[in-house]
């Protein structure tokens, strides 16, 4: 009886240890392919900062929510990032950066129609030059490619060129 009790105790201890270790496991990051979609939008715009850039003024609460959304996105929690951006958009619904960030989150989630819609809304209320404009049209182009609307994607890539405006020469 002691041997049986000892065997059950060892088995129970092993199972308890296994359960505790498995509770420490983290969720796997989002697939690399999905993450690279938004980077295809952001990276080229960041590299082309020579031209004229336009940035709207922001509410401090919106700035905080936007930064938290970026941190959640970088941690791989796209649902939390989208939730935080939705809250920020309730405060400032016509903020082109927020709308574009939401478009990029939708790209990462594979929600091509929504990504295109958010990018178009961002362009409608945002600047017609600079990084935001470039990110808008890259998002639209990528979303249309994923939706197999290749002619429309090519049109979006042409519009992208209009976003690059050189600042005036200062003497």
Indicate where each model-derived feature is located.
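Bacterial Sec signal peptide processing site at the extreme N-terminus
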Residues: 18-45, 171
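Alpha-helical segment of the N-proximal tetratricopeptide repeat
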Residues: 55-83
């Amino acid at each position: 009886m002691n041997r049986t009790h000892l065997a059950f105790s060892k088995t129970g201890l092993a199972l308890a240890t296994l359960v505790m270790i498995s509770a420490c496991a983290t969720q796997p990051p989002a697939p690399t392919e999905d993450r690279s979609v938004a980077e295809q939008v952001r990276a080229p715009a960041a590299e082309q900062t020579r031209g004229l850039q336009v940035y709207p003024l922001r509410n401090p609460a919106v700035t905080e929510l936007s930064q938290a959304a970026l941190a959640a996105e970088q941690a791989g929690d796209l649902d939390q990032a989208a939730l935080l951006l939705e809250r920020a958009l309730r405060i400032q619904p016509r903020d082109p950066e927020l709308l574009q960030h939401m478009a990029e989150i939708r790209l990462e989630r594979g929600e091509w129609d929504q990504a295109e819609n958010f990018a178009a809304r961002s362009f409608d209320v945002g600047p017609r030059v600079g990084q935001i404009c470039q990110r808008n049209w890259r998002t639209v182009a990528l979303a249309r490619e994923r939706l197999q609307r290749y002619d429309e994607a090519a049109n979006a890539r042409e519009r992208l060129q209009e976003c690059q405006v050189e600042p005036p020469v200062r003497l």
